[in-house]
Structure formats: C-alpha cells, structure tokens
Design a protein with these regions (language model features):
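Carbohydrate-active enzyme catalytic cores, enriched for enzymes
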Residues: 182-277
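Helix-terminus loop motifs that line ligand-binding clefts
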Residues: 26-66, 73, 169-177
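Active-site lining segments of carbohydrate-active enzymes
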Residues: 58-176, 187, 271-276
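Positions within ordered alpha-helical repeat solenoids
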Residues: 18, 38-41, 45, 80-84, ...
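Structural helix-adjacent loops and short alpha-helical linkers that scaffold large soluble proteins
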Residues: 20-33, 81-102, 140-155, 192-205, ...
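Non-membrane alpha-helical segments in proteins
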Residues: 7-22, 34-38, 72-84
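Alpha-solenoid HEAT/ARM repeat scaffold
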Residues: 10, 14, 30, 69-72, ...
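Alpha-helical scaffold elements that line and support the substrate/ligand-binding pocket
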Residues: 15-16, 20, 136-137, 178-192
C-alpha cells in the first residue's frame, strides 16, 4: 500500500522530465515542479519496510534521515532531474531539492558510520552496499563541485563489500540480483574511472561481471536459486557495457540480446541513470 504510490510518484517525475527534454518549450513543466516539491515534502525517502518503525515509534523522524536503497535512488533521480533541467527550473526550487539531497543522502553518507551496509559495524554485506553507494556517487557527481570526498568514502565501503564476495564472483541471491550488485558496482567503477581508476583486469571483478553469462541457460532463462526467477529482468545495457570494458565478446552479445525498451528502466524500480545509458 505504501510502495505503490511511492514508486508511481517517481515514475511520473521521470516521465515528465523526459517529456520536457524531448519537447522543450512545448512541454508542460508543472508535472516536474509538482513531482520535485512533493518528493521534497515526504518525511522520509526510505520505504516503510526499511524505516525501522515499531508500535512504540510508528512514524519516521524527518531530522534522522534513513539512507536505504530507495532513499539513495530518489536522490539520484532528483540529481539527474536538476542536471537535465538546470536552465528550466526556478532557482528556489533548485535550492530546495539540492538541500534535501544533501541532507538526506550525501551528508549521512559522509558523516555517519552506523548504517550496516557501510561495512563499519557489520561484515556480511550484500547488494545494498553498491546499490546505495552508486546512487550517492551519481548524486555527488551531479550536484557537488568536488565529488572526491564521496568517492574516497565510497572506496572503503566497496572494499568491504568486495571482501564478502567469493573469488569466483558468484552472487548467492541469483542472477537477477546482479543488476543491483555487480551492475551497481560497475556504475561506481565507471564514475571512479573519471579519476583515473582502471581495474578491469582484476580477476574477481571480471568474475563478478561475467556471473550472468555463467548462469545463462539460453532464451532468457537462468539457473534460479534463492528468490531469483528463472526468467528475470536483466539490465542488458549494463551487461553490454561490462562486456565492452572487459573486452568479452560473449558478455557483450548477451547484453545486446537482453536490452529492453527504455521504459523497462522505470518499471518496478525507477532507475534514471540506467534509462540514460
């Protein structure tokens, strides 16, 4: 009941942004403005399942922002919106959105050590780490003059995540989780490549990026285990990019074959950065 309108609001915003990008002055900017303002007015950007609500404390606290998967992803969506429509948006709206991204995503990322997925208090990490880190990195890249403080802190978190991954690069949650595990790690590494990082020959990384290729049974079917479907939605554009960076022709071909429509990236979980790739 909570997640349906939550994700619908973000899908509508992305669609409205694309409408303005495609049609320019003939497009209606008000759905973008309304979407941005409504999201800024939300008490929390975390979904209810991640908000740590209890009978004693049934409401989120706005002064204690929760940085979960979708709070980070919301920050990314808003950051791309501000970047794409920088000249179109009123300066006061731009300032409000920027301040909310800073308060809810970038500041907690830089100054808090208690979130389990950061790897400071817990060692058994999962796709939460690269998923959140990648979206905060996108936000910092779009909105800050110097994203390097975020990138440096991201390196420590990603190192902790990589220590949890076996040498064979396997994902114990199944092939579908590659999208937001190794696929999100790929997002991080491409951003860091702007600062000179080159790690594409690292054996564990290569194995992680090639994992779906090993799980493929053909015709869109994958060996399924944990809670992974036998025919999962795979982000073909990320697989293709991984294949190109690794100079791996079979992986590149798999990505090309699995590329869907742009609207697939705003389906269940709106992902603006993947939509633009």
């Amino acid at each position: 009941q909570c997640e349906t309108p939550y994700f619908a609001r973000r899908r509508k915003l992305i669609a409205a942004v694309l409408d303005v990008c495609l049609h320019g002055k003939s497009a209606d900017l008000s759905p973008v403005e309304d979407g941005l303002w409504c999201i800024c007015e939300e008490t929390t950007w975390a979904i209810s399942a991640h908000a740590n609500l209890t009978a004693a404390h049934p409401f989120p606290i706005s002064s204690e922002p929760i940085l979960d998967l979708f709070a980070a992803q919301t920050a990314m969506v808003l950051s791309f919106t501000l970047t794409l429509l920088d000249d179109w948006l009123d300066s006061s709206l731009h300032q409000r959105v920027t301040a909310e991204i800073q308060r809810r995503a970038i500041d907690p990322f830089l100054h808090r050590n208690t979130d389990w997925w950061m790897g400071f208090t817990r060692k058994d990490l999962c796709n939460w780490t690269p998923w959140i880190v990648s979206n905060v990195m996108f936000s910092a890249r779009c909105l800050t003059d110097d994203p390097l403080p975020v990138y440096r802190r991201a390196c420590g978190m990603l190192d902790a995540y990589l220590r949890c991954i076996p040498a064979d690069g396997g994902c114990d949650e199944g092939a579908a989780y590659w999208n937001m595990a190794a696929g999100s790690l790929l997002d991080c590494l491409e951003l860091m490549a702007e600062a000179g990082l080159n790690c594409w020959d690292e054996p564990k990384l290569r194995n992680m990026l090639r994992f779906p290729l090993l799980m493929s049974l053909g015709n869109g079917y994958f060996a399924n285990f944990a809670d992974c479907d036998a025919r999962p939605v795979m982000y073909g554009e990320r697989l293709q990019r991984a294949g190109e960076l690794l100079r791996d022709a079979p992986l590149t071909a798999m990505g090309q074959n699995l590329r869907g429509q742009p609207t697939d990236c705003i389906g269940d979980v709106p992902h603006f950065s993947r939509l633009l790739q």
